[in-house]
Protein backbone atom coordinates (compact mmCIF):
# COMPACT_ATOMS: atom_id res chain seq x y z
CA UNK A 1 0.00 0.00 0.00
CA UNK A 2 1.11 3.55 -0.65
CA UNK A 3 1.82 5.60 2.38
CA UNK A 4 3.71 8.54 3.64
CA UNK A 5 4.76 9.39 7.15
CA UNK A 6 4.80 13.06 6.27
CA UNK A 7 1.25 13.34 4.95
CA UNK A 8 -1.65 14.51 7.06
CA UNK A 9 -5.30 13.61 7.14
CA UNK A 10 -7.53 15.13 4.45
CA UNK A 11 -8.66 18.58 5.56
CA UNK A 12 -12.03 20.20 4.86
CA UNK A 13 -14.02 17.01 4.25
CA UNK A 14 -16.77 17.46 6.86
CA UNK A 15 -19.22 20.34 7.18
CA UNK A 16 -21.29 21.40 10.20
CA UNK A 17 -24.27 19.14 9.46
CA UNK A 18 -21.94 16.19 8.88
CA UNK A 19 -20.29 16.61 12.26
CA UNK A 20 -23.63 16.88 14.08
CA UNK A 21 -24.69 13.60 12.46
CA UNK A 22 -21.39 12.02 13.53
CA UNK A 23 -21.89 13.23 17.12
CA UNK A 24 -25.37 11.70 17.32
CA UNK A 25 -24.22 8.49 15.62
CA UNK A 26 -21.29 8.27 18.02
CA UNK A 27 -23.66 8.04 20.98
CA UNK A 28 -25.68 5.39 19.08
CA UNK A 29 -29.15 6.22 20.45
CA UNK A 30 -30.96 3.04 19.34
CA UNK A 31 -28.07 0.75 20.27
CA UNK A 32 -27.54 2.42 23.66
CA UNK A 33 -31.23 2.14 24.53
CA UNK A 34 -31.41 -1.50 23.43
CA UNK A 35 -28.14 -2.74 24.90
CA UNK A 36 -28.03 -0.71 28.08
CA UNK A 37 -31.60 -0.24 29.35
CA UNK A 38 -31.69 -3.65 31.05
CA UNK A 39 -28.28 -2.95 32.64
CA UNK A 40 -29.49 0.47 33.83
CA UNK A 41 -32.73 -1.00 35.19
CA UNK A 42 -30.72 -3.64 37.04
CA UNK A 43 -28.60 -0.91 38.63
CA UNK A 44 -31.27 1.66 39.56
CA UNK A 45 -34.70 0.17 38.81
CA UNK A 46 -37.24 2.83 37.86
CA UNK A 47 -34.69 5.62 38.36
CA UNK A 48 -33.24 5.20 34.85
CA UNK A 49 -34.67 8.54 33.64
CA UNK A 50 -33.16 10.28 36.68
CA UNK A 51 -29.74 8.70 36.13
CA UNK A 52 -29.74 9.89 32.51
CA UNK A 53 -30.90 13.37 33.52
CA UNK A 54 -28.33 13.89 36.27
CA UNK A 55 -25.54 12.46 34.14
CA UNK A 56 -26.50 14.77 31.25
CA UNK A 57 -25.73 17.89 33.32
CA UNK A 58 -22.05 17.05 33.99
CA UNK A 59 -21.79 15.51 30.51
CA UNK A 60 -22.67 18.90 29.05
CA UNK A 61 -19.84 20.29 31.17
CA UNK A 62 -17.46 17.84 29.53
CA UNK A 63 -18.87 18.74 26.10
CA UNK A 64 -18.18 22.40 26.92
CA UNK A 65 -14.64 21.44 27.89
CA UNK A 66 -14.11 19.66 24.55
CA UNK A 67 -15.62 22.63 22.72
CA UNK A 68 -13.30 25.15 24.35
CA UNK A 69 -10.20 23.00 24.05
CA UNK A 70 -10.83 22.33 20.36
CA UNK A 71 -10.74 26.10 19.76
CA UNK A 72 -7.10 26.33 20.82
CA UNK A 73 -5.69 22.95 19.74
CA UNK A 74 -6.88 21.19 16.59
CA UNK A 75 -5.60 17.63 16.97
CA UNK A 76 -6.95 14.22 15.96
CA UNK A 77 -5.82 12.93 19.36
CA UNK A 78 -8.21 15.33 21.14
CA UNK A 79 -7.95 14.73 24.92
CA UNK A 80 -4.66 12.89 24.43
CA UNK A 81 -3.13 16.15 23.18
CA UNK A 82 -5.06 18.58 25.41
CA UNK A 83 -4.44 16.77 28.70
CA UNK A 84 -0.79 16.23 27.82
CA UNK A 85 -0.28 19.95 27.14
CA UNK A 86 -2.11 21.20 30.24
CA UNK A 87 -1.89 18.68 33.09
CA UNK A 88 1.01 16.31 32.31
CA UNK A 89 2.11 14.23 29.31
CA UNK A 90 1.73 11.02 31.33
CA UNK A 91 -1.89 11.91 32.09
CA UNK A 92 -2.37 12.86 28.44
CA UNK A 93 -1.16 9.46 27.30
CA UNK A 94 -3.41 7.68 29.83
CA UNK A 95 -6.32 9.79 28.56
CA UNK A 96 -5.66 8.71 24.98
CA UNK A 97 -5.04 5.13 26.03
CA UNK A 98 -8.35 5.03 27.95
CA UNK A 99 -10.16 5.95 24.74
CA UNK A 100 -8.22 3.36 22.73
CA UNK A 101 -8.97 0.56 25.20
CA UNK A 102 -12.63 1.49 25.73
CA UNK A 103 -13.18 1.75 21.97
CA UNK A 104 -11.47 -1.59 21.35
CA UNK A 105 -13.62 -3.31 23.98
CA UNK A 106 -16.71 -1.71 22.50
CA UNK A 107 -15.91 -2.90 18.99
CA UNK A 108 -16.23 -6.45 20.30
CA UNK A 109 -19.17 -5.71 22.61
CA UNK A 110 -20.94 -3.84 19.81
CA UNK A 111 -20.24 -6.31 17.03
CA UNK A 112 -21.75 -9.23 18.94
CA UNK A 113 -25.25 -7.69 19.17
CA UNK A 114 -24.94 -6.54 15.55
CA UNK A 115 -24.52 -10.17 14.59
CA UNK A 116 -27.25 -11.29 16.98
CA UNK A 117 -29.76 -8.76 15.65
CA UNK A 118 -28.98 -9.61 12.04
CA UNK A 119 -29.74 -13.26 12.78
CA UNK A 120 -32.90 -12.31 14.70
CA UNK A 121 -34.33 -10.73 11.56
CA UNK A 122 -34.34 -14.20 9.95
CA UNK A 123 -34.67 -16.60 12.88
CA UNK A 124 -34.95 -15.51 16.52
CA UNK A 125 -33.64 -18.87 17.67
CA UNK A 126 -30.27 -18.17 16.04
CA UNK A 127 -29.84 -14.85 17.86
CA UNK A 128 -28.74 -16.61 21.09
CA UNK A 129 -25.97 -18.53 19.32
CA UNK A 130 -22.84 -16.69 20.49
CA UNK A 131 -20.51 -18.32 17.96
CA UNK A 132 -22.74 -17.52 14.98
CA UNK A 133 -23.40 -14.00 16.30
CA UNK A 134 -19.64 -13.50 16.53
CA UNK A 135 -19.10 -14.52 12.90
CA UNK A 136 -21.86 -12.27 11.56
CA UNK A 137 -20.79 -9.41 13.85
CA UNK A 138 -17.21 -9.75 12.65
CA UNK A 139 -18.47 -9.50 9.06
CA UNK A 140 -20.24 -6.22 9.88
CA UNK A 141 -17.08 -4.99 11.58
CA UNK A 142 -14.97 -5.74 8.50
CA UNK A 143 -17.44 -3.86 6.28
CA UNK A 144 -17.16 -0.78 8.52
CA UNK A 145 -13.39 -1.18 8.64
CA UNK A 146 -13.33 -0.99 4.83
CA UNK A 147 -15.58 2.10 4.85
CA UNK A 148 -13.35 3.90 7.37
CA UNK A 149 -10.26 2.92 5.36
CA UNK A 150 -11.88 4.44 2.25
CA UNK A 151 -11.73 7.96 3.66
CA UNK A 152 -13.71 10.51 5.63
CA UNK A 153 -15.96 11.43 2.71
CA UNK A 154 -17.11 7.82 2.20
CA UNK A 155 -17.45 7.44 5.97
CA UNK A 156 -19.78 10.39 6.38
CA UNK A 157 -21.90 9.42 3.37
CA UNK A 158 -22.48 5.97 4.84
CA UNK A 159 -23.21 7.56 8.20
CA UNK A 160 -25.82 9.94 6.80
CA UNK A 161 -27.79 7.01 5.35
CA UNK A 162 -27.59 4.75 8.42
CA UNK A 163 -28.25 7.42 11.03
CA UNK A 164 -30.96 9.09 8.95
CA UNK A 165 -33.01 5.88 8.76
CA UNK A 166 -32.35 5.08 12.43
CA UNK A 167 -33.48 8.50 13.70
CA UNK A 168 -36.59 8.44 11.50
CA UNK A 169 -37.62 5.08 12.98
CA UNK A 170 -36.96 6.26 16.53
CA UNK A 171 -39.03 9.41 15.97
CA UNK A 172 -42.01 7.35 14.76
CA UNK A 173 -41.84 4.98 17.72
CA UNK A 174 -41.41 7.83 20.19
CA UNK A 175 -44.78 9.18 19.00
CA UNK A 176 -46.37 5.70 19.15
CA UNK A 177 -45.07 5.21 22.70
CA UNK A 178 -46.49 8.55 23.87
CA UNK A 179 -49.98 7.59 22.67
CA UNK A 180 -49.84 3.95 23.79
CA UNK A 181 -52.78 3.13 26.08
CA UNK A 182 -52.17 -0.36 27.51
CA UNK A 183 -49.41 0.48 30.01
CA UNK A 184 -47.76 -1.50 32.80
CA UNK A 185 -47.35 1.56 35.06
CA UNK A 186 -48.57 5.17 35.02
CA UNK A 187 -45.91 7.84 34.53
CA UNK A 188 -44.50 9.07 37.84
CA UNK A 189 -42.49 12.27 38.28
CA UNK A 190 -40.51 10.54 41.03
CA UNK A 191 -38.65 8.67 38.29
CA UNK A 192 -36.80 11.94 37.70
CA UNK A 193 -35.95 12.37 41.39
CA UNK A 194 -33.58 10.67 43.84
CA UNK A 195 -36.05 8.53 45.79
CA UNK A 196 -35.56 5.37 43.69
CA UNK A 197 -31.75 5.23 44.07
CA UNK A 198 -30.28 2.76 46.55
CA UNK A 199 -28.16 5.32 48.35
CA UNK A 200 -25.07 7.11 47.05
CA UNK A 201 -23.43 3.96 45.69
CA UNK A 202 -26.61 3.06 43.81
CA UNK A 203 -26.69 6.50 42.21
CA UNK A 204 -23.01 6.17 41.24
CA UNK A 205 -23.63 2.78 39.61
CA UNK A 206 -26.51 4.23 37.59
CA UNK A 207 -24.46 7.27 36.59
CA UNK A 208 -21.63 5.04 35.37
CA UNK A 209 -24.03 3.17 33.08
CA UNK A 210 -25.56 6.49 31.97
CA UNK A 211 -22.08 7.70 30.99
CA UNK A 212 -21.91 4.77 28.56
CA UNK A 213 -25.21 5.91 27.01
CA UNK A 214 -23.75 9.31 26.14
CA UNK A 215 -20.24 8.23 25.21
CA UNK A 216 -19.24 8.74 21.59
CA UNK A 217 -20.34 12.30 20.78
CA UNK A 218 -16.68 13.37 21.11
CA UNK A 219 -15.83 11.66 17.81
CA UNK A 220 -16.23 15.16 16.36
CA UNK A 221 -13.00 16.18 18.13
CA UNK A 222 -11.11 13.22 16.69
CA UNK A 223 -12.27 14.39 13.25
CA UNK A 224 -11.15 17.99 13.85
CA UNK A 225 -8.24 17.82 11.39
CA UNK A 226 -10.68 16.75 8.68
CA UNK A 227 -13.43 19.27 9.48
CA UNK A 228 -14.15 22.66 7.95
CA UNK A 229 -13.88 25.56 10.44
CA UNK A 230 -13.06 22.95 13.05
CA UNK A 231 -12.32 25.39 15.89
CA UNK A 232 -16.02 26.26 15.94
CA UNK A 233 -17.68 23.26 14.34
CA UNK A 234 -16.42 20.28 16.34
CA UNK A 235 -17.35 21.68 19.74
CA UNK A 236 -20.73 22.97 18.60
CA UNK A 237 -21.58 19.61 17.01
CA UNK A 238 -20.68 17.80 20.22
CA UNK A 239 -22.99 20.02 22.28
CA UNK A 240 -25.87 19.62 19.82
CA UNK A 241 -25.28 15.86 19.71
CA UNK A 242 -25.48 15.53 23.51
CA UNK A 243 -28.74 17.51 23.51
CA UNK A 244 -30.36 15.37 20.80
CA UNK A 245 -29.45 12.01 22.33
CA UNK A 246 -30.49 13.19 25.80
CA UNK A 247 -34.03 13.78 24.54
CA UNK A 248 -34.14 10.39 22.80
CA UNK A 249 -32.77 8.57 25.84
CA UNK A 250 -35.29 10.17 28.19
CA UNK A 251 -38.30 9.51 25.96
CA UNK A 252 -37.48 5.84 25.44
CA UNK A 253 -36.35 5.11 29.01
CA UNK A 254 -39.59 6.58 30.34
CA UNK A 255 -41.50 4.59 27.71
CA UNK A 256 -39.82 1.37 28.89
CA UNK A 257 -40.78 2.16 32.50
CA UNK A 258 -44.38 2.85 31.52
CA UNK A 259 -45.03 0.12 28.95
CA UNK A 260 -42.85 -2.84 30.00
CA UNK A 261 -42.89 -4.69 33.31
CA UNK A 262 -39.67 -5.39 35.21
CA UNK A 263 -40.02 -9.06 34.23
CA UNK A 264 -40.20 -8.14 30.53
CA UNK A 265 -37.11 -5.94 30.84
CA UNK A 266 -35.14 -8.68 32.58
CA UNK A 267 -36.30 -11.37 30.16
CA UNK A 268 -35.47 -9.42 27.00
CA UNK A 269 -32.14 -7.97 28.16
CA UNK A 270 -30.34 -6.52 25.13
CA UNK A 271 -33.54 -6.91 23.06
CA UNK A 272 -35.62 -4.61 25.26
CA UNK A 273 -36.20 -2.11 22.45
CA UNK A 274 -37.62 -4.86 20.24
CA UNK A 275 -39.97 -5.83 23.08
CA UNK A 276 -41.08 -2.21 23.37
CA UNK A 277 -41.70 -2.06 19.62
CA UNK A 278 -43.80 -5.21 19.76
CA UNK A 279 -45.95 -3.67 22.50
CA UNK A 280 -46.66 -0.39 20.70
CA UNK A 281 -46.98 -1.94 17.21
CA UNK A 282 -47.77 -5.66 17.48
CA UNK A 283 -46.52 -7.78 14.62
CA UNK A 284 -44.16 -5.31 12.94
CA UNK A 285 -42.91 -3.02 15.69
CA UNK A 286 -40.29 -5.36 17.08
CA UNK A 287 -38.79 -6.11 13.67
CA UNK A 288 -38.66 -2.45 12.65
CA UNK A 289 -36.91 -1.44 15.87
CA UNK A 290 -34.45 -4.30 15.47
CA UNK A 291 -33.55 -2.73 12.11
CA UNK A 292 -33.04 0.64 13.86
CA UNK A 293 -30.83 -0.95 16.51
CA UNK A 294 -28.85 -2.82 13.86
CA UNK A 295 -28.25 0.38 11.89
CA UNK A 296 -27.31 2.22 15.08
CA UNK A 297 -24.89 -0.51 16.11
CA UNK A 298 -23.18 -0.61 12.73
CA UNK A 299 -23.09 3.20 12.60
CA UNK A 300 -21.45 3.46 16.00
CA UNK A 301 -18.93 0.76 15.06
CA UNK A 302 -17.89 3.17 12.34
CA UNK A 303 -17.56 6.18 14.66
CA UNK A 304 -15.72 4.09 17.25
CA UNK A 305 -13.27 2.95 14.58
CA UNK A 306 -12.70 6.61 13.72
CA UNK A 307 -12.02 7.49 17.35
CA UNK A 308 -9.56 4.71 18.02
CA UNK A 309 -7.71 4.95 14.69
CA UNK A 310 -7.41 8.75 14.81
CA UNK A 311 -6.15 8.53 18.39
CA UNK A 312 -3.56 5.91 17.43
CA UNK A 313 -2.63 8.02 14.40
CA UNK A 314 -1.92 11.00 16.69
CA UNK A 315 0.11 8.78 19.02
CA UNK A 316 2.11 7.34 16.14
CA UNK A 317 2.71 10.83 14.76
CA UNK A 318 4.03 11.92 18.17
CA UNK A 319 6.03 8.69 18.52
CA UNK A 320 4.37 7.75 21.80
CA UNK A 321 3.35 4.54 20.01
CA UNK A 322 5.05 2.89 17.00
CA UNK A 323 5.57 5.60 14.38
CA UNK A 324 4.06 3.37 11.68
CA UNK A 325 0.64 4.12 13.20
CA UNK A 326 1.07 7.69 11.97
CA UNK A 327 1.30 6.67 8.31
CA UNK A 328 -1.39 8.00 5.99
CA UNK A 329 -2.51 6.35 2.74
CA UNK A 330 -1.66 8.48 -0.32
CA UNK A 331 -5.01 7.99 -2.03
CA UNK A 332 -7.53 7.79 0.81
CA UNK A 333 -5.76 10.07 3.32
CA UNK A 334 -6.56 7.67 6.16
CA UNK A 335 -4.23 6.18 8.81
CA UNK A 336 -4.19 2.78 7.14
CA UNK A 337 -1.66 1.14 9.45
CA UNK A 338 -3.66 2.11 12.54
CA UNK A 339 -6.83 0.83 10.87
CA UNK A 340 -5.17 -2.49 9.96
CA UNK A 341 -3.80 -2.97 13.48
CA UNK A 342 -7.15 -2.22 15.11
CA UNK A 343 -8.86 -4.63 12.73
CA UNK A 344 -6.42 -7.42 13.54
CA UNK A 345 -6.67 -6.95 17.31
CA UNK A 346 -10.47 -6.80 17.18
CA UNK A 347 -10.71 -10.03 15.19
CA UNK A 348 -8.55 -11.81 17.79
CA UNK A 349 -10.82 -10.50 20.54
CA UNK A 350 -13.90 -11.70 18.63
CA UNK A 351 -12.54 -15.24 18.82
CA UNK A 352 -11.62 -14.87 22.51
CA UNK A 353 -15.06 -13.51 23.41
CA UNK A 354 -16.65 -16.86 22.57
CA UNK A 355 -15.07 -18.30 25.71
CA UNK A 356 -16.56 -15.60 27.95
CA UNK A 357 -20.22 -16.65 27.90
CA UNK A 358 -23.42 -15.40 26.32
CA UNK A 359 -23.88 -12.15 24.43
CA UNK A 360 -25.73 -10.68 27.42
CA UNK A 361 -22.96 -11.59 29.90
CA UNK A 362 -20.28 -10.09 27.69
CA UNK A 363 -22.28 -6.89 27.22
CA UNK A 364 -22.94 -6.34 30.94
CA UNK A 365 -19.27 -6.56 31.97
CA UNK A 366 -18.05 -4.65 28.91
CA UNK A 367 -20.44 -1.73 29.47
CA UNK A 368 -19.33 -1.32 33.09
CA UNK A 369 -15.63 -1.60 32.19
CA UNK A 370 -16.00 0.95 29.40
CA UNK A 371 -17.81 3.26 31.83
CA UNK A 372 -14.74 3.31 34.09
CA UNK A 373 -12.44 4.20 31.20
CA UNK A 374 -14.82 6.86 29.89
CA UNK A 375 -14.90 8.47 33.33
CA UNK A 376 -11.10 8.71 33.32
CA UNK A 377 -10.59 10.45 29.98
CA UNK A 378 -13.68 12.66 30.22
CA UNK A 379 -12.67 13.73 33.72
CA UNK A 380 -9.12 14.57 32.66
CA UNK A 381 -10.42 16.58 29.68
CA UNK A 382 -12.69 18.58 32.00
CA UNK A 383 -9.73 19.46 34.22
CA UNK A 384 -7.60 20.29 31.18
CA UNK A 385 -10.14 22.87 29.99
CA UNK A 386 -10.14 24.62 33.37
CA UNK A 387 -6.34 24.74 33.44
CA UNK A 388 -6.06 25.93 29.82
CA UNK A 389 -8.56 28.76 30.41
CA UNK A 390 -7.59 29.57 34.01
CA UNK A 391 -6.30 33.07 33.18
CA UNK A 392 -9.52 34.07 31.40
CA UNK A 393 -12.13 32.70 33.82
CA UNK A 394 -12.75 35.98 35.63
CA UNK A 395 -13.26 38.07 32.49
CA UNK A 396 -17.03 37.57 32.59
CA UNK A 397 -19.68 35.46 34.36
CA UNK A 398 -20.08 33.41 31.15
CA UNK A 399 -16.34 32.64 31.05
CA UNK A 400 -16.44 31.57 34.69
CA UNK A 401 -19.51 29.35 34.25
CA UNK A 402 -18.86 27.84 30.81
CA UNK A 403 -15.08 27.72 30.95
CA UNK A 404 -14.52 26.94 34.61
CA UNK A 405 -17.33 25.91 36.91
CA UNK A 406 -19.33 23.65 34.58
CA UNK A 407 -16.35 21.73 33.11
CA UNK A 408 -14.88 21.40 36.62
CA UNK A 409 -18.17 20.02 37.91
CA UNK A 410 -18.24 17.58 35.00
CA UNK A 411 -14.70 16.42 35.77
CA UNK A 412 -15.40 16.03 39.49
CA UNK A 413 -18.55 14.05 38.72
CA UNK A 414 -16.69 11.68 36.40
CA UNK A 415 -13.97 11.00 38.97
CA UNK A 416 -16.57 10.54 41.70
CA UNK A 417 -18.55 7.90 39.82
CA UNK A 418 -15.27 6.16 38.96
CA UNK A 419 -14.29 5.82 42.63
CA UNK A 420 -17.78 5.07 43.93
CA UNK A 421 -18.41 2.37 41.35
CA UNK A 422 -15.27 0.34 42.00
CA UNK A 423 -16.79 -1.36 45.03
CA UNK A 424 -20.10 -2.07 43.31
CA UNK A 425 -19.02 -3.60 39.99
CA UNK A 426 -18.49 -7.25 39.19
CA UNK A 427 -14.84 -8.37 39.49
CA UNK A 428 -14.66 -9.05 35.74
CA UNK A 429 -15.72 -5.48 34.94
CA UNK A 430 -13.12 -4.02 37.34
CA UNK A 431 -10.36 -6.23 35.95
CA UNK A 432 -11.21 -5.27 32.36
CA UNK A 433 -11.58 -1.58 33.21
CA UNK A 434 -8.53 -1.06 35.44
CA UNK A 435 -6.37 -3.74 33.85
CA UNK A 436 -6.88 -2.20 30.43
CA UNK A 437 -5.68 1.16 31.73
CA UNK A 438 -2.70 -0.41 33.52
CA UNK A 439 -1.47 -2.06 30.31
CA UNK A 440 -0.99 1.44 28.89
CA UNK A 441 1.83 2.11 31.36
CA UNK A 442 4.13 -0.15 29.32
CA UNK A 443 4.14 1.83 26.03
CA UNK A 444 3.96 5.11 27.95
CA UNK A 445 7.16 4.46 29.90
CA UNK A 446 8.92 2.85 26.93
CA UNK A 447 8.42 5.79 24.57
CA UNK A 448 9.12 8.29 27.34
CA UNK A 449 12.53 6.64 27.75
CA UNK A 450 12.95 6.79 23.96
CA UNK A 451 12.70 10.59 24.16
CA UNK A 452 9.43 11.33 22.34
CA UNK A 453 8.89 15.08 21.96
CA UNK A 454 5.34 14.58 23.25
CA UNK A 455 6.82 14.42 26.75
CA UNK A 456 8.28 17.93 26.32
CA UNK A 457 5.10 19.73 25.23
CA UNK A 458 4.37 23.35 24.43
CA UNK A 459 1.97 24.39 27.17
CA UNK A 460 -1.64 24.99 26.17
CA UNK A 461 -2.78 28.40 27.41
CA UNK A 462 -5.98 30.01 26.13
CA UNK A 463 -4.85 33.47 27.22
CA UNK A 464 -2.18 33.37 24.52
CA UNK A 465 -4.84 32.41 21.92
CA UNK A 466 -2.87 29.72 20.13
CA UNK A 467 -3.96 29.95 16.48
CA UNK A 468 -1.59 27.54 14.75
CA UNK A 469 -2.99 24.16 13.74
CA UNK A 470 -1.01 21.03 14.52
CA UNK A 471 1.66 20.69 11.83
CA UNK A 472 3.02 17.14 11.49
CA UNK A 473 6.74 16.62 11.04
CA UNK A 474 7.67 17.14 7.41
CA UNK A 475 4.47 18.96 6.47
CA UNK A 476 4.70 22.65 5.50
CA UNK A 477 3.01 25.09 7.87
CA UNK A 478 1.34 26.85 4.96
CA UNK A 479 -0.54 23.66 4.14
CA UNK A 480 -1.96 23.48 7.64
CA UNK A 481 -2.99 27.10 7.47
CA UNK A 482 -5.38 26.22 4.70
CA UNK A 483 -7.32 24.01 7.06
CA UNK A 484 -10.13 26.50 7.33
CA UNK A 485 -12.36 28.43 5.01
CA UNK A 486 -12.69 26.10 2.03
CA UNK A 487 -15.96 24.68 0.73
CA UNK A 488 -16.32 21.07 1.90
CA UNK A 489 -19.99 20.13 1.94
CA UNK A 490 -21.17 17.74 -0.75
Give the location of each predicted region.
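Helix-loop-helix junctions that connect adjacent transmembrane segments
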Residues: 5-8, 48-49, 125-132, 160-291
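Membrane-helix boundary/coupling elements in multi-pass transport proteins
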Residues: 75, 98-113, 219-227, 283-323, ...
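C-terminal membrane-solvent junction of multi-pass transporters and transport-like membrane proteins
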Residues: 10, 325-332, 375-426
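Membrane-interface loop-to-helix entry segments
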Residues: 132-183, 238-242, 373-376, 402-409, ...
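Extracellular loop-to-transmembrane helix junctions
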Residues: 32-130, 241-251, 429-441
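Membrane-interface "cap" regions at the ends of multi-pass membrane proteins
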Residues: 1-38, 42-47, 59-60, 64, ...
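TM-loop-TM module centered on a large, flexible mid-protein loop between adjacent transmembrane helices
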Residues: 81-83, 88, 120-125, 239-305, ...
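A generic transmembrane alpha-helix motif of multi-pass inner-membrane proteins
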Residues: 36, 368-370, 374, 401-490
Amino acid sequence: MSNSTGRGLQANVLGTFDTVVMAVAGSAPAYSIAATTAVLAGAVGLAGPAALLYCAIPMLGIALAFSRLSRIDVNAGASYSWVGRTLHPFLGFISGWALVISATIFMVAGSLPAGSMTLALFDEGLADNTALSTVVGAAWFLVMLAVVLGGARLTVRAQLIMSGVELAILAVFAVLAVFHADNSLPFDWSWLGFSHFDGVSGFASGALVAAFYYWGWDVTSNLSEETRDSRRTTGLAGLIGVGIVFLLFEVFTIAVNVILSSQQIEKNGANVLAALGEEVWPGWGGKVLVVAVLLSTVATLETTLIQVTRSLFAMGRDRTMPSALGRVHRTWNTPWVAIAVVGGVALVLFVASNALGSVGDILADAISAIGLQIAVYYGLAGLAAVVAYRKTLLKSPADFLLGGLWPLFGAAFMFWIFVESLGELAPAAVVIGIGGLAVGLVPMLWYWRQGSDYYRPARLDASRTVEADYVPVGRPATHAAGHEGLSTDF
